[in-house]
Amino acid sequence: MEWLSQPAPLVAPALLGMVLVRQFADGLQVRAQIVETEAYTAGDPACHAYRRKTQRNQVMFGPPGHLYIYRIYGLYHCLNIVTEPEGIPAAVLIRAAQLDRLPDWIPANKQNQPARAAAGPGLLCQALRIDGSHNGWRLERAEAGQEGIWLEGSPSWQTQLSIVQTTRIGITQGAEIPWRWYIGGHPAVSRY
């Protein structure tokens, strides 16, 4: 997946329609079609690495194809895929996805609205049971009996999707930058 070494604003829309696979040690796999993304890069005031490299954001500095997981509001985890060549801090936030199945740990109030089970970055991580322990993981297919997280499918520039580009949401700095993409009309896009 060398294409992940491109700038985050190119990778973010390309991830739409691809499938994020989460494999658990017991062999269970949950697939989530990516329907919404946001890009964050060096020089962007909303980027966690805007000021400097820290222990918290060091994964953003590469190499590309690794996971940058952080917690927001002290409650929810967010999943990002690191992009750009090593040394340049950048990542794509996976804001929302459509699950192929609802695991039994999904709360009952989400069972009647399956498209909404991962319709936001915190919900996505809850649905895939991704937390801070996954920070720094490499996106790669796991062998049977091992945990793993990887991508399947082709970048969206190779498919026919109705992609909408707009400004990012839920941030106070850099909110005017149009680095949010989503699949138009998809029921799993976050409502933020």
From Swiss-Prot:
Broad class of enzyme this protein falls into: hydrolase
EC nos: 3.2.2.-
Top-level taxon: Bacteria
Entry keywords, A to Z: DNA damage, DNA repair, Hydrolase
Pfam families per record: Pur_DNA_glyco (PF02245)
Positions of transmembrane segments: none
InterPro entries in the cross-refs: Formyl_transferase-like_C_sf (IPR011034), MPG (IPR003180), MPG_sf (IPR036995)
GO MF terms held by the record: alkylbase DNA N-glycosylase activity; DNA binding
Biological-process GO terms, alphabetical: base-excision repair
Record family assignment: Belongs to the DNA glycosylase MPG family.
Family annotation (NCBIfam families): 3mg
Name of the molecule in the record: Putative 3-methyladenine DNA glycosylase
Organismal lineage: Bacteria, Bacillati, Cyanobacteriota, Cyanophyceae, Synechococcales
